[in-house]
Amino acid sequence: MEFSHPPVSVSQLGETIALVLGGKAKSVKIALGEITVTVAAADYLAAATLLRDAPGCKFEQLLDLCGLDYSEYKNGQYDGLRYCVSSHLLSVSLNQRVRLKVFCPDDDFPVVDSVNGIWNSANWFEREAFDLYGIVFEGHNDLRRILTDYGFIGHPFRKDFPTTGHVEMRYDAEQKRVIYQPVTIEPREMIPRVIREDNYGGLQ
């Protein structure tokens, strides 16, 4: 495939994105050869539309979207908002990529706008983030669970979700069917004690 424009450098692309988004970009950072753009929830849809349509950006494809839970980030030293939605965007025509991040403004009820109307590939990705993290995507036309079982309680990728879950499944001989019941396994520490010690291996 021949591109109409040669790929620009990462720093040049970062400057272009910062110029296009203006005040809608809370930060534009470059690390490990990748650009990460963070926007406020109120500017999420407008910023996403600009990244898709603006000359020099043209990110026509959303490759991936996932949720993140920062509640235990940096060993509990992180004091920002808990839930984040991170997307990876690709410009096929300009051969360039960017990561777009937005934090949910309310930790107790995480909500951001759906970008399904901008990139329809976001449909199942947003359902997955809703299922696993409990992030609500306002404007999504079919926000149902997609991976967990019917009647599943909670959101299993949240840092405070118990490793044993809330219910277990077993075959009941009397009823001659599979049933669900509260878990009978007691939670226990699965990390070897030596690794849990402070400053193990010089780690801070």
Swiss-Prot record:
It is an enzyme of class 7 (translocase). Pfam families: Complex1_30kDa (PF00329). Gene3D superfamilies: NADH:ubiquinone oxidoreductase, 30kDa subunit. Its main location: membrane. Signal peptide: none annotated. One of its GO terms (cellular component) is plasma membrane. It is found in: Cell inner membrane. Keywords: Cell inner membrane, Cell membrane, Membrane, NAD, Quinone, Translocase, Transport, Ubiquinone. It catalyses: a quinone + NADH + 5 H(+)(in) = a quinol + NAD(+) + 4 H(+)(out). Its EC number is 7.1.1.-. SUPFAM superfamilies: Nqo5-like. NDH-1 shuttles electrons from NADH, via FMN and iron-sulfur (Fe-S) centers, to quinones in the respiratory chain. The immediate electron acceptor for the enzyme in this species is believed to be ubiquinone. Couples the redox reaction to proton translocation (for every two electrons transferred, four hydrogen ions are translocated across the cytoplasmic membrane), and thus conserves the redox energy in a proton gradient. Belongs to the complex I 30 kDa subunit family. PANTHER family: NADH DEHYDROGENASE [UBIQUINONE] IRON-SULFUR PROTEIN 3, MITOCHONDRIAL (PTHR10884:SF14), NADH DEHYDROGENASE UBIQUINONE IRON-SULFUR PROTEIN 3 (PTHR10884). This is NADH-quinone oxidoreductase subunit C. The gene is nuoC.
